[in-house]
Amino acid sequence: MKSELNDDNLSIVKDYFNIVLVGNPSVGKTSILEKYVNNAFQANLENKKLIEIYKKQICLYTNSYKLKFWDITKFIGNNDISEIDMFYNCDGIIFVSSYDDKSSLENLNIWYQLLIEYVDLSTKEMVWLINKKDLNEGKVITEEQIEKKSKDLQLDYYEVSAKSGENIEEGIKKVVKKLILRCNDIEENDDNSFESSTADSANSIDIEEGKSCSIF
């Protein structure tokens, strides 16, 4: 039987995690990571790489963990996804949609089905972020649609803003916390001992479509 989390029974089984972000282009995946890692925001970021890599070190449950984020900046077709190692080797998956892009909600199913074809999702921890929560007008996705999609795909979700940073840390924390608990075979509880990060960095790599990339 699994036990509850406390500092006495938590061991560092694994001190780094690979997390992949997927979703439509221009929904704010890179902006979310820029805000989370560098506390920076720039509207209309243009990505010329297939993949952007961000790294961040965090302290959770008094231990230090290294996070490596793989930002898929372009839509990957069915022939490409099977050849990219990150989907096999990742620990967590963050789906991203945007309030001003209705197709980003619809295409969530496409990403999900592509991943199911090549990856055992029962071995991954996942969360869904809906960006641009800060918009006062121009939203084309309703809360009812979000609730239904969350239920259909069984995804926890967070409404976030890459501009203000609202709920970004909470959403990413959800994935990381689940990963730590999974590694330690511990039940999730309401513990909130999540401290700020120390070392941050962001890097990008240029990967040709269809080529594989190594993890750590």
Predicted regions and their residues:
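TRAFAC-class small GTPase G-domain
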Residues: 1-187, 216
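C-terminal-of-GTPase-core extension/linker across diverse P-loop GTPases
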Residues: 178-216
